[in-house]
Amino acid sequence: VERAGWLMQPPPGHDEFLEWNTRIHGLTARDVVRAPGWSAQLPALTAFAGDDVLVAHNAGFDMSVLRRASEATGDECPPYAYLCSLQVARKTYDLESYRLPLAAAAAGFLDFPHHDALADAEACARIMIDAAERHGAHDLAALADTLSLRIGRIAVTEKANV
């Protein structure tokens, strides 16, 4: 699993750091004041992701963030394919809760700094790898098929010609 992480300034109008969000992820406006913005970093993100299927826990939310950030900046969001590790965990493990730390623990990934984006991404990857091994799937498409899940695709809107 390749790893990459970076901070970026949120798009204007989406750059308020609410106290309850900061309590969750620990980031403040001061942390990103010198970071490049979404438009400047989107090429690096797309180069890193390539044509891979993206994975996130409650992936629909994360994909909407990618789409909305692109819309807010006038950038074109790639129509990434994605699979949700929460859905995979629900069909793989018998847990009282499928929150990321518990699902990751079921996959053998313990004691990570939850809500650290890079650590959360690695936890999702570990869930997918463990689930694929348990179900005898050789890739994410086979895993989705085995579990009767659909690989989603980010719904993108055409850029307006202004």
Please place each PLM-identified region on the residue numbering.
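Extended aliphatic helical segments
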Residues: 1, 32-33, 53-55, 65, ...
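Conserved non-catalytic scaffold segment of RNase H-like nuclease domains
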Residues: 1-79, 94-97, 101-111, 115
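Conserved beta-strand -> loop -> alpha-helix junction used to position metal-binding or nucleic-acid-contacting
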Residues: 76-89
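Generic recognition of well-ordered alpha-helical segments
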Residues: 88, 103, 123, 127-130
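Conserved catalytic/binding loops enriched for acidic/polar residues
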Residues: 120
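Acidic two-metal-ion nuclease catalytic site recognized across multiple nuclease folds
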Residues: 125-162
